[in-house]
Amino acid sequence: MRSREVSLVLLALVLCPAPRGSAAPVTAGRAGALAKMYTRGNHWAVGHLMGKKSVAESPQLREEESLKEQLREYAQWEEATRNLLSLLQAKVAQGHQPPRWEPLSIHQPAWDSKDVSNFKDSGSQREGGNPQLY
């Protein structure tokens, strides 16, 4: 659809060339000083409005940019998935077994809370020191 619009615009430009001369034609009665002062047009906003319409504001370009960004993100996710899959396959090939998970209630503490004699004696083994400082 876009190519049809572009071709119609190009055809219109070829068939209807713009007149050569000043940008805004001046009537014969005012052709004196006014034509010399405002050679590019007699409206004060001509200079202010020139170039104000940005190409980036076009909805088609925004849509294309968002599609490109979505494609980049998709490619990154695809690469990350491939990397993760290759890591998992490498672990399976090595015969790595994931640890078995047990409920926390089955675990017992590594030391018996009633047997604290080792903690009291550890400071007294040092020569001439205060056991509480070590």
Curated annotation (Swiss-Prot):
- Ranges of compositional bias, category Polar residues: 119-134
| Biological process terms in GO annotation | mast cell degranulation; negative regulation of voltage-gated potassium channel activity; negative regulation of voltage-gated sodium channel activity; neuropeptide signaling pathway; positive regulation of behavioral fear response; positive regulation of peptide hormone secretion; positive regulation of phospholipase C-activating G protein-coupled receptor signaling pathway; positive regulation of respiratory gaseous exchange
Superkingdom assignment = Eukaryota
Q: Where in the cell is it found?
A: Secreted; Cytoplasmic vesicle, Secretory vesicle lumen; Cell projection, Neuron projection
Extract the ranges annotated as region (Disordered): 98-134
Which Gene Ontology terms of cellular component type are present? extracellular space; neuron projection; secretory granule lumen
- Which terms in the Gene Ontology molecular function aspect does this entry carry? neuropeptide hormone activity
**Keyword tags:** Amidation, Cell projection, Cleavage on pair of basic residues, Cytoplasmic vesicle, Mast cell degranulation, Secreted, Signal
Residues excised as propeptide: 54-134
Q: Which residues carry this modification: Methionine amide?
A: M50
The record's section on InterPro entries has: Bombesin
Report the main location listed first in the record.
secreted
Q: Which residues form the signal peptide?
A: 1-23
Its family remark reads:
Belongs to the bombesin/neuromedin-B/ranatensin family.
Functional note = Stimulates the release of gastrin and other gastrointestinal hormones. Contributes to the perception of prurient stimuli and to the transmission of itch signals in the spinal cord that promote scratching behavior. Contributes primarily to nonhistaminergic itch sensation. In one study, shown to act in the amygdala as part of an inhibitory network which inhibits memory specifically related to learned fear.
What is the name listed in the Swiss-Prot or TrEMBL entry for this protein? Gastrin-releasing peptide
Query: Which species does this protein come from?
Result: Ovis aries
This protein's encoding gene: GRP
